[in-house]
Regions:
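Extended, highly charged
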Residues: 3-141, 145-147, 151, 186
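A short secondary-structure junction signal
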Residues: 129, 155-157, 177
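Conserved small/polar residues in nucleotide/adenosyl-binding loops
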Residues: 178-185
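Conserved phosphate/anionic-ligand binding catalytic regions in large, soluble enzymes, centered on
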Residues: 1-2, 164-177
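Acidic loop->beta-strand submotif enriched in PP2C/PPM serine/threonine phosphatases
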Residues: 154-164
């Protein structure tokens, strides 16, 4: 962010959004502008965009063919909003409003705590695809990786794990089934 001329402030003073935009420049620019407007309407300051450096040559043909344009957006925490959950709630609202207004952009994550790196590739390709994950300057307290092949849907960039808040192996439906009241309990 320093190289881009952005003053993001201290820890948890900013939110980072990871976006999968359309490759088409006009549609991408329209979606970016829409997000900027929504952030401002939600009382926050939009700081700028960053192209996420990637190495598509490590991916398979199909993944490259449908690869989105990957960018990060930076949002400054308002002075009147506390760090942590209050700020993340504001970011959540901005994300949801944006998702309702944009059909062809996927918000991978938007948070002051986490940045989700994901895609349509194997676990071993994660680090080689995203240049950020190879950088000595990049630090993280925790990293979670999840790998699973799609069993009942076609693979896509947005369906790849991890999701914004958790990693799972598809057993959620089973758990829900076991916790639902039985018809015999009625």
């Amino acid at each position: 962010t320093r190289a881009l001329g952005m003053d993001i402030g201290g820890e948890r003073e900013y939110g980072v959004g990871m976006f999968f935009f359309p490759q088409e420049e006009l549609r991408r620019n329209q979606a970016k502008k829409m997000f900027e407007i929504i952030v401002e309407k939600e009382g926050m300051e939009f700081l700028g965009w960053r192209e996420v450096p990637t190495f598509p040559n490590v991916l398979g043909h199909k993944a490259v063919e449908c690869m989105p344009y990957i960018m990060q957006g930076f949002v400054k925490k308002p002075a009147d909003v506390e760090k942590g959950l209050p700020f993340d709630r504001r970011l959540y609202i901005a994300r949801r409003v944006f998702e309702q207004s944009s059909d062809d952009t996927y918000v991978v994550s938007l948070s002051s705590r986490t940045i989700v790196y994901k895609g349509m590739f194997l676990v071993g390709q994660l680090r080689t695809f995203f240049a950020d994950l190879q950088s000595e300057d990049y630090e993280s307290a925790i990293a979670m990786v999840h790998s699973r092949f799609s069993t009942n849907t076609n693979p896509s960039w947005e369906r790849a794990h991890p999701n914004r808040l958790m990693v799972h192996n598809g057993e959620i439906n089973t758990c829900l089934l076991y916790t639902s009241p039985s018809p015999r309990d009625s």
